[in-house]
Regions:
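Outer-membrane beta-barrel pore domains
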Residues: 1-189
Length: 189
């Protein structure tokens, strides 16, 4: 054999279930993401046919091909890799690519005119192999959203079917640099 086989150590596992018909709770999403291993620290590996192989320290998103993993400082692919745009030192590398995270999403459609969803994520970061944090950093992100679709005989025709959506979001912890809050109001058809 001219290859080396390794156990899976880093994972992104997800589960989604949709209930039918629509109800107060009609969708559940759970995700688990583990990126702390990254082939482990540097080690020398070999077999009878591969005389020398150096592995480890994969450094996810930091393979010095930056245009492939970010665009204008924003991470592409997974939002849990904190974007280089937020680096206080001006570098374009990802400072927290070794972490474990849990994500939960819930959604419902209790009537023809009302929808809601909730998203919550917990993350524990270690930094990188090259620049580890001196202590673990934690973060919690939450978002709640409700949508009401306008309807009824007294409404002007142009207002019927318009969605009015209100969202509230917050994150707390050291990974995203402090506590942040926001609200959003959306009107769309």
């Amino acid at each position: 054999h001219r290859y080396l086989l390794y156990d899976f150590k880093d994972w992104m596992l997800g589960f989604e279930y949709r209930f039918k018909p629509d109800n107060w709770l009609n969708s559940i999403v759970f995700e688990y993401l583990y990126t702390k291993y990254q082939s482990g620290p540097i080690y020398h590996d070999h077999t009878l046919t591969v005389p020398d192989h150096i592995g480890g320290r994969d450094d996810f998103y930091n393979h010095y091909i930056f245009p492939g993993y970010q665009h204008w400082g924003q991470a592409m692919g997974n939002p849990l890799y904190r974007s280089p745009l937020y680096n206080e030192d001006g570098t374009v590398e990802f400072h927290n690519n070794r972490f474990v995270a849990f994500h939960l999403g819930l959604g419902g459609h209790p009537s023809d005119y009302v929808k809601w969803r909730f998203l919550g994520t917990w993350q524990e970061g270690l930094g990188t192999y090259e620049k580890p944090y001196t202590k673990k950093h934690h973060n919690v992100s939450l978002m709640g959203e409700a949508t009401y679709t306008l309807h009824g005989g007294r409404l002007p025709e142009w207002l019927k079917g318009v969605d009015v959506r209100m969202g509230v979001g917050a994150d707390f912890g050291a990974i995203l640099r402090g506590n942040n809050y926001g609200i959003q109001l959306t009107v769309c058809k």
